[in-house]
């Protein structure tokens, strides 16, 4: 707080840690999932041939989302909104059948709780749509895995992000100071 006061921010009363965990996941047809004991028991493939299709096609990341997955995402959003978890973005990811949900950031404690809710609600919602949501970090050999990117920062109670670069040299000095201190 003393450093912020040196930069002229007299109104700041506290600094908090904020976070937003981008959750990647795979959606698999339930009937196909049920035929794979390794997926059922371990949430990943342990035997069998590698995927015949990798990331070389154009049906990932910027590809269109199928209507079925769109309905899943809509229902997921509705359920999460009712719990106070707001998704900022949802899109396809690099591997076939892989997607990502990025919630709006919150204080780190709340964001951690939100991520637990997101994972639980994803699984339940997928089942209602005849799919299984796989959250294992590497469910399929030879394909990108599912990561969890954590967008972490420090913010003030007045809404200032201390890890956002400034627009002027003076404002950038504050950013560089906090970045170096971390």
Model-predicted segments: where are they?
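Glycine-rich, acidic/polar active-site loops that bind/position phosphate-bearing ligands
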Residues: 1-135, 140-182
